[in-house]
Regions:
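Conserved nucleotide-sugar phosphate-binding/catalytic loop shared by glycosyltransferases and other
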Residues: 2-10, 30-83, 231-233, 322
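Active-site-proximal region of nucleotide-activated glycan assembly enzymes
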Residues: 42, 53, 116-178
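Donor-nucleotide binding loops and adjacent catalytic segments primarily
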Residues: 46, 178-271, 304-307, 312, ...
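Structural loop-to-beta junction motif characteristic of Rossmann-like glycosyltransferase folds
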Residues: 52, 120-121, 269-270, 287-295, ...
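Glycosyltransferases and closely related glycan-assembly transferases
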Residues: 87-100, 108-123, 136-140
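Acidic donor-binding loop of glycosyltransferase active sites
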Residues: 97-99, 262, 266-280, 288-289
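A short, well-ordered alpha-helix in the C-terminal region of glycosyltransferases
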Residues: 342-356
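C-terminal alpha-helical cap of glycosyltransferases
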Residues: 355-376
Length: 376
């Protein structure tokens, strides 16, 4: 069996694909797996690190601007798109793909369109409640549309294609043990705060986190704080933290990217993060109480919708970016850590939301689509 996964841009598209690929490899150890991504995306780091082969396409999404620069960019993107579809057809043929699985990101569209043109079985996983542009564009080509939330089904034209599977997360998010992970990371008995605002980072949130670390120093470092800065902030944030009188020490840990996220999240007592669907589901699988600060810079405000859905079930505290100060976050951290009853209720609510067998469900569907070619 030869399986192609196509994804890219951010960890939220890539990590679910890796989770499913790992389960597929466990079920079918003789399978060959190939990823198709975009030039310059996080997939260039994450996919090889996970042990899978990657081929990339010229990147770049469409601009929504009607300016000359926006139109010029879109002309280039459309040219690259046609070229990428043809390149994907060649990759699929040369690899002898039996199925193509997309989990979002620029590269998914040409790869899934190519699969459709070649009559190769394919499925698409949409992580958000409201489908994104790529998902809507590839629906006609895909055999199955896999969604996280039952209420999302109404957005799809062909209901016979839609199946609810939840969000695939790596098994480590489910099975890691807190104390073992804390020991592995060399952490002491103080509470652990994990903050991360996406694989690329977020300027306003990194600035807020730097100030939060200053408040933590002022308070005598009552907890340990691990922060994933992101690639865009790595050049300037460590310097900003130093200017506030804080340095990496036994309580402050700055990382450009947290590659061992399942371990770090399992060790954490509280997670502070954006509210992308992938992140929300990883937090739910790990059962770690969280403070969600949804990004206001996303299509259809989908992150706030994700965050509010968790908040309504008692599974998250939500602070909108416009109201997000370091002091507000510090106060919320203290509130969660001091009220153990509320903390435990949030932990339990998160575990109720999680779909721990989501990756298994996707593999079941992949086996159905390739019936006759797979062997259990």
């Amino acid at each position: 069996m030869n399986v192609i996964f196509t994804c890219g841009g951010t960890g939220g598209h890539i990590n679910p694909a890796i989770a499913v690929a790992n389960i597929w490899k466990e079920r079918h150890p003789d399978s060959n797996i190939l990823f198709i991504g975009a030039d310059g995306g996080m997939e260039e780091q994450l996919v090889p690190k996970a042990g899978f082969q990657l081929k990339t396409l010229p990147g770049g999404g469409l601009s929504r601007s009607l300016s000359f620069a926006g139109i010029k960019k879109n002309v280039k993107v459309m040219y690259n798109l046609v070229s990428s579809v043809n390149r994907c057809k060649k990759i699929i043929k040369d690899f002898g793909a039996d199925i193509v699985v997309g989990t979002g990101g620029y590269a998914s569209f040409p790869a899934l369109m190519a699969a459709g043109l070649l009559k190769i079985p394919s499925c698409v996983h949409e992580s958000n409640a409201v489908p994104g542009l790529t998902t809507r564009m590839v629906e006609r080509w895909a055999d199955k549309m896999l969604i996280c939330f039952p209420q999302s089904a109404r957005y799809y034209k062909d209901q016979s294609k839609v199946q609810v599977v939840g969000m695939p997360v790596r098994s480590e998010f489910i099975h890691n043990k807190k104390q073992a992970c804390r020991e592995e990371l060399g952490l002491d008995s103080r509470p652990v705060i994990l903050s991360t605002f996406g694989s690329l980072g977020a300027k306003a949130m990194n600035e807020m986190t730097a100030e939060l670390m200053r408040l933590e120093k002022e308070a005598g470092y009552p907890f340990q704080h691990i922060h994933g800065v992101g690639s865009y902030g790595w050049e300037w944030m460590p310097k900003l933290v130093e200017e506030k009188g804080v340095r990496n020490n036994d309580a402050i840990f700055l990382k450009e990217y947290i590659y061992n996220m399942p371990t770090v999240m399992a060790a954490a007592d509280i997670v502070i993060s954006r509210a992308g669907a992938s992140t929300c589901n990883e937090i739910a699988a790990a059962g770690v109480p969280c403070i969600l600060i949804p990004s206001p810079n996303v299509t259809a405000n989908h992150q706030e919708k994700n965050a509010r859905a968790l908040e309504e079930q008692g599974a998250a505290a939500v602070i909108l970016e416009e109201n997000c100060t370091a002091q507000a976050v510090m106060d919320k951290i203290r509130q969660l850590l001091e009220d153990r009853n509320a903390y435990n209720k949030m932990h339990d609510a998160l575990l109720e939301i999680a779909v721990p067998d989501s990756a298994q469900r996707m593999c079941d569907i992949m086996e159905e689509l390739t019936s006759g070619k797979t062997k259990k």
